[in-house]
């Protein structure tokens, strides 16, 4: 029996066809295309599922699971709020089912990542564990006494939106000083752009031009080339 797992991120949609023991048989990744709207994102999810299930007998597929950033209703598959996707009360489960025929199980991305680590990963055998996910945003998942800690609204372990500096950098959620506003790829890109504006001679400009945009790699590439300004973009912290 095989299963399909999808990681919906603010930058990429990643999927895998896995066995019952967690062994990966096939992997797929494509851009999320958040800027094109929810329909385009759902089309991308459907394309990933279609590619992963190609050539696999549906009777051999035990199910499809998707991890989504933000607050998710695990029972209905509705995304209550996902700031990095711009979604509020969005019926993701229904949208993907209408495109693929698969009835997905959907949960918060960091929660399901924590569950996977507890079942077959580095936290296997542990009664309690905490996982922090880093990407476009910052997520958190908590396993407490062998059970997922989700809270009444499913947002109990949203570690990325703990305020670590009152009145600090603005977060995509609208608040200021969140962990995510300092430790995510979004924060790194912001700091890289600031460093580039302050240092027009920096090699970060050439690195960004080569990649077609300023992204999470820009400062690291420039630093590897000996750029003096690039390390500051990476090393900045709220302390």
Residue ranges and their predicted role:
Residues 3-7, 61-65, 105, 129-133, ...:
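Short glycine-aspartate micro-motif
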Residues 11, 69-72, 135-137:
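Short glycine-rich anion-binding loops that position phosphate/pyrophosphate groups of nucleotides
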Residues 2-43, 78-81, 154:
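Short glycine-rich, Thr/Ser-proximal phosphate-binding strand/loop in the N-terminal lobe
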Residues 33-34, 38-46, 50, 54, ...:
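Glycine-rich phosphate-binding loop and adjoining helix at the ATP-binding site
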Residues 124-183:
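Glycine-rich phosphate-binding loop of actin/hexokinase-like ATP-binding domains
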Residues 27-28, 73-78, 167-173:
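Acidic/polar active-site rim loop that often engages polyanionic ligands
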């Amino acid at each position: 029996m095989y299963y399909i797992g999808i990681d919906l991120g603010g930058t990429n949609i990643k999927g895998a066809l896995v066995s019952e023991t967690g062994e990966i048989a096939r992997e797929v990744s494509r851009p999320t295309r958040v800027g094109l709207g929810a329909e385009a994102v759902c089309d991308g999810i459907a394309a990933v599922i279609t590619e992963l299930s190609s050539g696999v007998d549906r009777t051999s597929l035990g199910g499809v699971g998707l991890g989504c950033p933000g607050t998710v209703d695990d029972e209905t598959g509705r995304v209550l709020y996902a700031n990095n996707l711009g979604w509020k009360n969005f019926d993701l489960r229904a949208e993907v089912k209408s495109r693929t025929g698969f009835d997905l199980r959907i949960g918060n991305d960091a929660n399901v990542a924590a569950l996977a680590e507890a079942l077959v990963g580095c936290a296997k055998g542990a009664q309690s564990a905490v996982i922090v996910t880093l990407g476009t945003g910052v997520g958190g998942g908590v396993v407490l006494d062998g059970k997922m800690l989700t809270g009444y609204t499913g947002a109990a372990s949203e570690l990325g939106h703990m305020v670590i500096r009152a009145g600090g950098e603005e977060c995509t959620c609208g608040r200021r000083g969140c962990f995510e506003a300092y430790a995510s790829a979004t924060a790194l890109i912001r700091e890289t752009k600031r460093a580039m504006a302050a240092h027009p001679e920096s090699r970060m400009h050439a690195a960004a031009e080569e990649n077609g945009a300023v992204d999470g790699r820009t400062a690291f590439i420039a630093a590897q080339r000996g750029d003096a300004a690039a390390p500051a973009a990476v090393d900045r912290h709220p302390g």
